[in-house]
Amino acid sequence: MKNSFLENLNQGVHGLKPYEPGLPLEHTQKKLGLDKMIKLASNENPLGPSPKALDLLQGKMNTFSSEFNRYPDGNAYELKEAISKKYNVNLNQITIGNGSNDLIEFVSRCFLGEGKKAIYSQHGFAIYPLAIKATGALPVKSKAKNWGHDLELMSDLIDDKTKVIFIASPNNPTGTAKTLSEIKDFLKNLPDDILVFLDQAYYEYIEGSEFDIPFSLIDDYPNLVISRSFSKAHGLAALRLGFCISNPELSDYLNRVRQPFNANSLALDLGKVALFDQEHISKSVKINSSGMHKVKKAFSNLNYNFIESWGNFISFDAKQDSDLAFQYFLEKGVILRSLKVYEMPQHLRVSIGTEEEMDFFLRVLEDYEKDLSKK
């Protein structure tokens, strides 16, 4: 029997392919029957959550459990106060998301629809075209330059139907980043009726002051939205929490399409503590920098081309079909990310893990290179 009601699906939903997350660690290890397996596929913080956030969780466990029947603070007031204090922004500039993906959805729902366009970059985050298409709008893919955003080309692609431009710095999965000067030049020459969503989920890992893009830039460019995430350096990926800063009028509209209780109580309470745990953030960045240096050195020694990264991951040319390479590492106990879906048919992405995890990955990489050279 034909489900005729499916004929009424919104046009943009037809043909959508769902986002595919990294393989789950325990299930995959059990399925393959391996004694040891590590996951370096989802750009998670190998140190885990902020210790101060965990201390709060332990101390308030009884309180939390007795309040599970209560809705969370729908306005996230205390978390917004913490963000306001740390970044010197006004409360009415802040929008809280269930992860930063939520914020991408807010912007798409507010500004996109049938007959409209949004521009994103080749090799850019897979959620951008999904969010655009779901509204019925047309995603316009701008060809990448040196694995990153070609801002000049993105400007050239603008027409009277363009409403939003998505930019990530650092960009996932390539790790490329844009300097403040490059972003300023781009905004300066952009029509002020086009919204720019600057995704900075990996902001804390950036090394180099030239890449520091302050929230105060919004004062000069009210069509700019800057998003951040608690999933990476803060180690709260499981709680799904992010935020964006925009001009107050825009923030008002973003909050109108936001679900009333989109961030749960645990996320709100732990987020405001993790935000100020600078010791944990610094340690996370230090471990990432050390692991990045080690893996880049190994890639160079084994003659693997890699893309310079400003995130907590690095992508490299596996010298063969990325799905085949992914399967090899998987069977050896390392979950990586194949980048074929990102139009990078020979590239794998590896998240920077603990020293022990990176040593394990590099041993498998050496075995991979030996086996590859036999073919």
Pin down the residues of each PLM region:
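Short acidic capping loops at alpha-helix termini that bridge into adjacent secondary structure
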Residues: K36, N90-I94, G115-K117, K161, ...
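N-terminal small-domain helix-loop-helix segment of the aminotransferase-like
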Residues: K2-G99, F106
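PLP-dependent aminotransferase-like
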Residues: C110-I167
